[in-house]
Regions:
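Mature, function-bearing regions of proteins
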Residues: 1-177
Length: 177
């Protein structure tokens, strides 16, 4: 189960989790299809303090890598979290597996915000953002989301491939997996 998996991930880096609550922010499966460029896991202790954040990055080849960040007490009380990680996963044929990510996360409350900067040898190579508002999980909100954007997971994959085609047509260097 996902719970067993996340508990093992936390234990591997020495985080005492004690069965606290876990939330994941990811794309939904729609008509049997999903793609999550990034899933963000929020791991809380029994006292409801945020103990760890895991950024799980996926590529279109089915590979994934997790960047697990234990939080100090100061971090857990901060409204904005900043994390850095060395890039470990081949994500794009137009970017090498060098450099690193800088994450800026606002996890609290009714709104959520994530900014990811991929920095290579030449400076910023990519900046991606994701903003969301919390809503109730019920049939009404699910139906509304489906009608509003029925194929959002497919749209994400199409946009990634469209951008790759655009970069390829501009004769950007390609690095193959």
């Amino acid at each position: 189960s996902l719970r067993v998996w996340i508990d093992a991930q936390l234990a591997e880096v020495g985080i005492e989790f004690d069965g606290g609550r876990v939330q994941i922010l990811c794309m939904p499966r729609v008509l049997g299809h999903t793609f999550n460029p990034i899933s963000v896991w929020f791991c809380y202790g029994p006292d409801e303090a945020l103990r760890a954040v895991m950024y799980e990055v996926h590529n279109t080849f089915g590979d994934r890598h997790s960047y697990l960040v234990p939080l100090s007490e100061n971090d857990a009380q901060s409204r904005v979290l900043h994390h850095d990680a060395v890039k470990q996963l081949y994500v794009s044929p137009f970017m090498t597996v060098t450099g690193g990510y800088s994450f800026r996360l606002e996890p609290a409350g009714e709104a959520y915000s994530l900014l990811i900067r991929y920095e290579g040898e030449e400076g910023d190579r990519l900046i991606a953002t994701h903003h969301a508002k919390r809503s109730a999980l019920n049939w009404r909100t699910l139906l509304h989301a489906f009608v509003k954007a029925p194929m959002i997971p497919l749209k994400v994959v199409m946009e990634i491939h469209w951008e790759a085609l655009h970069l390829f047509s501009r004769k950007r260097a390609a690095f193959f997996h």
